[in-house]
């Protein structure tokens, strides 16, 4: 089975890459900066991103399953970039005959979502928009907890500096955290 992993330099992508290398798959990575990856003889690397259609189509060529772990949060126009990225990916995946997209998105209700979470939901909707031509599996996770994750480090820092904290009455955010190892396991479970 030929698998494409996008977002291989990210928090989840780095861990998923290591797990996929232990599986019986042919692994290809689409990355902007190949120099930032650990060299591995068992992976094929395509340099590019979802805005470079030639590189994107090359990366998806011959692929059975593609992991979509892309998010443009660093850019102030991230909502529009996320939408364009997802649409480009979906179009190229269909054109190249990919059978399945696996997307890791956020957990929440669209009507109550923050702008950031709404962007993640809209990305999932775009990737799921053509079920007759491609299967999309949408894993929706809350706060991902694990050593090195932004959420984990914020919580760890707060508990070290402020072991007891009084919060205002309006602080009522509910969260459903999930361990990073569980996210990776679910991502692997839906591979085949």
What are these regions (language model features)?
Residues 3-25:
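N-terminal Rossmann NAD(P)H-binding glycine-rich loop of SDR-like oxidoreductase domains
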Residues 6, 30, 69, 101-106, ...:
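SDR active-site strand-loop-helix element
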Residues 25-32:
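Conserved glycine-rich Rossmann-like NAD(P)H-binding loop of the short-chain dehydrogenase/reductase
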Residues 35-98, 106-112:
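NAD(P)H-binding glycine-rich loop region in Rossmannoid oxidoreductase-like domains
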Residues 95-100, 132-134:
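A short helix->loop->beta-strand "cap" motif at the edges of active sites that frequently abuts
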Residues 111-140, 147-157:
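Active-site Tyr-X1-5-Lys
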Residues 157-178, 182, 186-190:
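A conserved pocket-lining segment of Rossmann-fold NAD(P)-dependent short-chain dehydrogenase/reductase
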């Amino acid at each position: 089975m030929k698998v494409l992993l996008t977002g291989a330099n990210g928090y989840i992508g780095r861990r998923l890459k290591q797990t996929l290398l232990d599986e019986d798959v042919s692994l290809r990575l689409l990355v902007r900066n190949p120099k930032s990856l650990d060299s591995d003889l068992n992976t094929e690397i395509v340099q590019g991103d979802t805005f470079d259609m030639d590189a994107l189509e090359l990366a998806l060529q011959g692929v059975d399953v593609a992991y979509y772990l892309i998010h443009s949060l660093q850019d102030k126009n991230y909502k529009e970039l996320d939408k364009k990225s997802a649409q480009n990916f979906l179009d190229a995946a269909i054109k190249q005959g990919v059978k399945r997209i696996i997307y890791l998105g956020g957990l929440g209700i669209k009507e109550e979502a923050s702008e950031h979470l709404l962007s993640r939901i809209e990305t999932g909707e775009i990737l799921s928009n053509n079920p007759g031509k491609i299967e999309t599996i949408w894993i929706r996770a809350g706060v991902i907890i694990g050593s090195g994750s932004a959420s984990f480090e914020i919580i760890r820092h707060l508990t070290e500096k402020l072991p007891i904290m009084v919060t205002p009455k309006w602080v009522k955010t509910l969260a459903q955290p999930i361990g990073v190892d569980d996210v990776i396991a679910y991502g692997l479970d839906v591979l085949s």
